[in-house]
Amino acid sequence: MERARITVFDTTLRDGEQSPGCSMNVHEKLRMAHQLDRLGVDVIEAGFPIASEGDFQAVKGIGAAVRRPIIAGLARACALDIERAWEALKGAARPRIHVFLATSDIHLKYKLRISREQCLEQARGSVRLARSFCNDVEFSPEDATRTDRDFLVQLVQAVVDAGATTVNIPDTVGYTMPAEFGEIIQMLRERVRGIENVVISTHCHNDLGLAVANTMAAIAAGARQVECTINGIGERAGNASLEEIVMAMRVRPDRYPYDTAVASEHLYPASQMLSEITATPVQPNKAIIGRNAFAHEAGIHQDGVLKNPLTYEIMTPQSVGVPDSRLVLGKHSGRHALSLRCEQLGYQFERRELDEVYRKFVVLADQIKNVEDHHLLQLIRETRVQTPRIPLAHVEISPAVIATGTGYAVPAAVERHPLEITLHSAHDHHAEQEDYLWGV
């Protein structure tokens, strides 16, 4: 029996960037987009084109340079936003306009100051306008989980009839419970005519620590797209963690018999790159990619792991791209060992650049016992030389997709298109837009 395919929609570059202190400029977004392409995500939400010139250029530049995945741009349900989004996306090989509009009574009354009838008409009209530019249109009813259920059905019916190809159900404030969220998805599948022709998506926030649990409940109820971020970064307490969702399905196919195109061995490099770009450390006990995720201190656990790793590990470090922990870097380590670990983290240097990093490494290694990955990333961040990623052409991925078990191929290299863009701040949006600019 063929396993159902789950579409992975990565919003690290849009919602993830809304995490305090995690803004990225155009160049950094482009680097991260190439890493997401290596990872094999299906959709990259590259930004919010109306928000700033930087976001516009990021969406435009990523659409020109990253050709395999769908490239999405966010837009409010108004003509100016939708037209600006299309202007940024029209050069992409596979563009998607993602339109959102708040639908809960509290948002309609206090933020938008419109009636339910006006909300319906605005949603319907915005989807029709977006479809006039683009065949792939996603609609999100912001704060869907606090929206009156009957009105949510009415709203989703309106946008499906207007031509939306994906309907995303956001738990915008992380309010719902897993069983409840699954019931919402099931309700829409039962009550909305034509919903079987539309992809149902989820977008869960982590305010109660339930973003991944809610996402998994929605998958079980019939959702077939998951919106998530690397390291779970995002507004307030963050978003559903991409690495946790992917590995939950991979480790428990008995409960979640679904496939994704994600090449899981690129999860750790993606996590480390994002941490380096945003200068935000990954918490040590973070599931899947934290420093302690495969660490064992208790004697009984250590004994079990030495005899058979499966006694206390439900996945291998290699399956998520964690470098070989047997290579310990210290003050006696040479350039070759340092260079190898940097390559495992996704960095490759010319000799002059490696020398500068190595000089700083030796100084640090004299001060601490072991130099770990987060120390190396800090050294790289502080080094004034260029620190390019390993070129895509150097990354070899089996056509069968190494260690994924999915059968969905991720290309070994992605064609680079000429890109001439000025670097702008990706978050120059203050005093230009309404307070409700950032949504979903």
Task: Map each language-model feature to its residues.
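Structural signal for hydrophobic packing residues in well-ordered secondary-structure cores
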Residues: 37-40, 63-66, 70, 89, ...
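Short catalytic-loop micro-motif centered on adjacent basic/acidic residues
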Residues: 43-47, 70-73, 139-141, 201-203, ...
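Catalytic alpha/beta core domains of metabolic enzymes, predominantly
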Residues: 176, 183-307, 312
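A mid-to-C-terminal "edge-of-domain" accessory segment
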Residues: 5-6, 10-12, 247, 253-425, ...
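Short, ordered loop/turn segments at secondary-structure junctions
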Residues: 13, 48-49, 74-77, 101-103, ...
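Alpha/beta enzyme core
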Residues: 6-8, 18-43, 56-65, 79-200, ...
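Short hydrophobic alpha-helical segments enriched in small aliphatic residues
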Residues: 428-431
